Each structure stands twice: as C-alpha cells, then as structure tokens.
C-alpha cells in the first residue's frame, strides 16, 4: 500500500509539472497582444458594453460590464470600488454609480494587476481617485506585466492554438 501511494504521488507530481513547465515556457515564442488585440480576442466591444447593477445590501452593489466585476460601496466617506475594468467604459461605470446615489469614485482597490481589473486606474488616477493595491500588484502594473493566456482555451479556440 505504501508503494502504491508513492507511485500515485509521483505520477501526480510528474503530470502536474508539465502544466507548470508549459505555463513558464509557452510565451517564449507566442505573439504578445496589445489591449486592442486582447479585446478582439475576447469579443469585447466597449461601445456596446452595458453596465448592469445588482444590489447586494444597503450601500453595497456589484457592477457587471466587460471583464472583471466591480464591487461598489457607498458610505459616509464616499464611494469605494473594488476593481475598475477599463478607461473606455469609465463614463458608463460612473453613470451607474450615480444612478445608485454615488458621486464620483473616491477610492479604488485593485484586487490584482490584470488589465480587466485595474486598467481603469488610468482614468481614475487623473480624476483624483485614491488607488490602493498590494505592492506586488503595483510593481506588476508599473512594469507592464504580461499575462500568459496560452493555457486559456475556449471550445471555439481549442483547435486554433498559437501557444
């Protein structure tokens, strides 16, 4: 029984290490996409994007649009959002916040540095919004970190892999 466990664990380790290797090496020859290329790949259209609001509790909402969702807290100290999508839809996001009683965005918390969660910083920062992020997320945002999407496949793209 002890040997069977060892064989199982060894097999699991070897099988999972291939995915780690692929993640670390897949982007060496892959073409990097800019934001326009990524939005086209995901089928996102900022112009036709609608922001949908859902109330979670008094003063607490979630906004759905394109990419990551946005948490919104309305309180006596102002409006706090968690994640902020893209500058191209910020006017729609701010309109949705206004519709629920907020005025502007006072604080934006970034959960992480991915473009669909933090790219809106580029619109909010110049407006005076206080932006909060973990120091590692800040480093990745400042360095223009690359997201390896080579392991992300949809049924439509499974036969057309470029990674």
Describe the residue ranges of each PLM region.
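Surface-exposed loop and adjacent secondary-structure segments within mature catalytic domains
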Residues: 131-150
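Bacterial N-terminal signal peptides that target proteins for export
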Residues: 1-8
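Metallo-beta-lactamase
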Residues: 106-116, 137
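Bacterial N-terminal signal peptides
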Residues: 10-17
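Conserved small/polar residues in nucleotide/adenosyl-binding loops
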Residues: 153-158
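Metal-dependent catalytic neighborhoods of phosphoester/phosphodiester hydrolases
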Residues: 118-127
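Conserved beta-strand hairpin/beta-sheet module of binuclear metal-dependent hydrolase folds
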Residues: 52-96
């Amino acid at each position: 029984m002890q040997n069977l466990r060892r064989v199982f664990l060894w097999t699991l380790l070897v099988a999972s290490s291939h995915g780690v290797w692929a993640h670390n090496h897949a982007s060496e020859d892959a073409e990097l996409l800019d934001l326009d290329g990524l939005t086209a790949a995901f089928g996102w259209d900022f112009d036709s994007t609608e922001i949908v609001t859902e109330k979670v509790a008094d003063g607490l909402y979630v906004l759905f649009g394109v990419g990551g969702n946005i948490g919104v807290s309305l309180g006596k100290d102002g409006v706090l959002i968690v994640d902020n999508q893209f500058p191209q839809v910020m006017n729609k996001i701010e309109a949705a916040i206004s519709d629920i009683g907020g005025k502007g965005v006072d604080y934006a918390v970034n959960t992480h540095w991915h473009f669909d969660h933090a790219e809106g910083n580029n619109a909010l920062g110049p407006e005076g919004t206080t932006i909060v992020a973990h120091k590692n997320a800040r480093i990745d945002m400042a360095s223009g970190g690359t997201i390896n999407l080579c392991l992300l496949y949809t049924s439509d793209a499974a036969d057309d892999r470029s990674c």
